C-alpha cells in the first residue's frame, strides 16, 4: 500500500507541475467540523493531495464558530502545501442575503497564502442564493450592488462562481456571475447519469468567456426527518468520471469530502455527524472511492479520454441489504428512489497485466478475465453472506479479501454503501 500511495503522490506532483490551470477541488461541509483542530484539517488536506485534489470549497453557514474553523483550515493548508487552495462557498440556504457577513468573511481570508485566486480575483462560490436580491430588483443587480462592487471598491475584487442550479443555463447568463457550479451530479430517475447538462453548460460558458465547474459525486442517500431519499448510484462514480474525461470541463468539484448526511463523503469519517445520520454512516468507510478517483483525476488534468492507470488494485462497494429489506425499528418511511438501486456487488479492477478476478457472495461464485486497464464486474447480492474477492495471475494469488456481511433486515433503512479496496 505504501508503494501505491508513493506512486499516486509522485504522479500528482507531476500533474501539478504541468497542468496548474486544471483543478479538481472537493466540496467541504464546515458545518460538520465543530470538534476539528488544525491537525484534523492537516490530515484531510494531506489525504486530498495524495489523490490529486487541489483544494477545498469551504461550504459555510452563519455560525461564528465556523469562521474560526475556516481560520484553522487556512493555517493548516499553509503548513502542508502552498499549492493546496481554499475558497469560501457561502451556503445561502442558511446565510440568506446577509451582505455584511459575506463581505466580512471574504475580506478576512482574501490575503491568506492558500486562498484561491482566479483571473487575479478572489474566488468565491455559493450553494444556492439565486433568490437573494438584497432588496434590489433582480439577482444580478443585488449581488453586484450589495457584494461585488463594495468588495471591489475595498480592494477585494471577486471571481464569482455560484451554484444557482435552479436557473439552469440562465445561471451563466446572469451578468454578475463569472462562472457556474452545477449541482446536477445525480440522476433523479431510474436512468443512469448522462453528460447532456455538462455539454450545454460548458459550451455556453465557452461562448460567454465564463467558467464552468462540473460536479462529480459517488453516491447519494439521506435518511433524515426532513429529507429521505436515494438516487441511483450503482456505477455513478465511474459513469461520472468517464463523462468528465469526455467533456473536459474547466474545473471539477467533487461532491463531497464530508457530507455525511447525504452519504457522498470520500474523506475519513471525523468531526461531527449530522444528528440522525449516525445509523447509516458509522461503519461505512468511503476512502476506497477516494483512491479510485486518482487515475481519473490524473487523466483529466492531462486531457486524456481514458483514466491513467499506473497501479493495480481492486475496489468494491455494495449496500448492506437488498432494496426489498425491511426496517424493524424505523420511525421514517422507505426512502423514495430506493427501488432504483440494483441489488448487486460492484467491482472495479485496475490492472497493468491480465489477471483472473473471482467474486463470491453466498452460493454464487464468478471468475472474470481482467485485462490491462479498467475492468468493471458485478455479481448479485445474497443475504446472510459476506462477499469475498480474489485476484490471481499465472496461478498465484495477488490479493484476497472479504467485505462486511449482507443481511436481510436492519433496524433502520440503509442505502449507504460499504466500500473496500485490495492493493497488489
Swiss-Prot record:
Processing after translation: Not glycosylated.
Domain of life: Eukaryota
Family in the record: Belongs to the glycosyl hydrolase 71 family.
Subunit structure: Monomer.
Coiled coil: none
Reactions catalysed, as given in the entry: Endohydrolysis of (1->3)-alpha-D-glucosidic linkages in isolichenin, pseudonigeran and nigeran
Signal peptide: 1-20
Entry-linked Pfam families: Glyco_hydro_71 (PF03659)
Physiological role: Has a role in cell separation where it is required for the degradation of the cell wall material surrounding the septum (the septum edging) which must be hydrolyzed before full separation of the daughter cells can occur. Hydrolyzes 1,3-alpha-glucan predominantly into pentasaccharides.
A GO-annotated cellular component: extracellular region
Gene, per the UniProt record: agn1
Protein name: Glucan endo-1,3-alpha-glucosidase agn1
UniProt GO MF annotations: glucan endo-1,3-alpha-glucosidase activity
Main localization category: secreted
Keywords assigned by UniProt, alphabetized: Cell cycle, Cell division, Cell wall, Cell wall biogenesis/degradation, Glycosidase, Hydrolase, Secreted, Signal
GO biological process per UniProt: cell septum edging catabolic process; fungal-type cell wall disassembly involved in conjugation with cellular fusion
EC number: 3.2.1.59
Subcellular location: Secreted; Secreted, Cell wall
Amino acid at each position: 500500500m505504501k508503494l501505491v500511495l508513493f506512486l499516486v503522490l509522485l504522479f500528482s506532483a507531476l500533474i501539478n507541475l504541468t497542468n496548474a490551470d486544471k483543478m479538481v477541488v472537493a466540496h467541504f461541509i464546515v458545518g460538520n467540523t465543530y470538534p476539528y483542530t488544525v491537525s484534523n484539517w492537516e490530515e484531510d488536506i494531506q489525504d486530498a493531495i495524495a489523490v490529486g485534489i487541489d483544494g477545498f470549497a469551504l461550504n459555510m453557514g452563519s455560525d461564528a464558530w465556523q469562521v474560526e474553523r475556516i481560520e484553522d483550515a487556512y493555517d493548516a493548508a499553509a503548513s502542508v502545501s502552498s499549492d493546496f487552495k481554499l475558497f469560501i462557498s457561502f451556503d445561502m440556504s442558511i446565510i440568506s442575503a446577509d451582505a455584511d457577513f459575506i463581505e466580512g468573511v471574504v475580506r478576512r481570508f482574501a490575503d491568506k497564502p492558500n486562498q484561491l485566486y482566479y483571473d487575479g480575483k478572489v474566488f468565491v462560490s455559493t450553494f444556492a442564493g439565486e433568490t437573494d436580491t438584497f432588496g434590489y430588483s433582480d439577482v444580478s443587480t443585488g449581488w453586484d450592488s450589495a457584494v461585488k462592487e463594495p468588495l471591489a471598491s475595498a480592494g477585494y475584487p471577486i471571481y464569482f462562481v455560484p451554484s444557482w442550479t435552479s436557473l439552469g443555463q440562465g445561471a451563466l447568463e446572469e451578468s454578475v456571475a463569472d462562472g457556474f457550479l452545477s449541482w446536477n451530479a445525480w440522476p433523479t430517475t431510474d436512468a443512469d447519469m448522462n453528460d447532456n447538462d455538462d455539454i450545454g453548460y460548458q459550451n455556453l460558458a465557452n461562448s460567454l468567456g465564463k467558467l464552468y465547474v462540473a460536479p462529480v459525486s459517488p453516491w447519494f442517500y439521506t435518511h433524515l426527518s426532513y429529507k429521505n431519499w436515494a438516487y441511483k448510484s450503482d456505477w455513478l462514480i465511474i459513469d461520472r468520471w468517464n463523462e468528465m474525461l469526455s467533456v473536459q470541463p474547466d474545473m471539477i468539484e467533487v461532491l463531497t469530502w464530508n457530507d455525511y448526511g447525504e452519504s457522498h463523503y470520500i474523506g475519513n469519517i471525523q468531526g461531527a455527524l449530522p444528528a440522525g445520520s449516525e445509523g447509516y454512516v458509522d461503519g461505512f468507510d468511503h476512502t476506497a472511492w477516494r483512491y479510485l478517483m486518482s487515475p481519473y483525476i490524473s487523466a483529466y488534468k492531462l486531457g486524456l479520454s481514458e483514466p491513467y492507470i499506473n497501479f493495480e488494485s481492486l475496489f468494491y462497494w455494495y449496500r448492506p441489504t437488498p432494496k426489498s429489506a425491511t426496517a424493524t425499528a424505523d420511525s421514517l418511511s422507505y426512502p423514495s428512489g430506493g427501488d432504483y438501486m440494483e441489488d448487486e456487488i460492484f467491482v472495479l479492477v485496475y490492472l497493468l497485466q491480465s489477471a483472473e478476478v473471482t467474486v463470491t457472495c453466498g452460493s454464487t461464485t464468478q471468475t472474470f478475465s481482467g485485462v490491462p486497464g479498467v475492468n468493471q464486474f458485478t455479481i448479485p447480492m445474497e443475504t446472510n453472506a459476506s462477499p469475498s474477492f480474489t485476484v490471481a495471475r499465472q496461478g498465484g494469488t495477488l490479493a484476497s479479501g472479504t467485505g462486511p456481511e449482507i443481511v436481510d433486515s436492519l433496524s433502520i433503512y440503509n442505502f449507504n454503501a460499504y466500500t473496500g479496496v485490495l492493493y497488489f
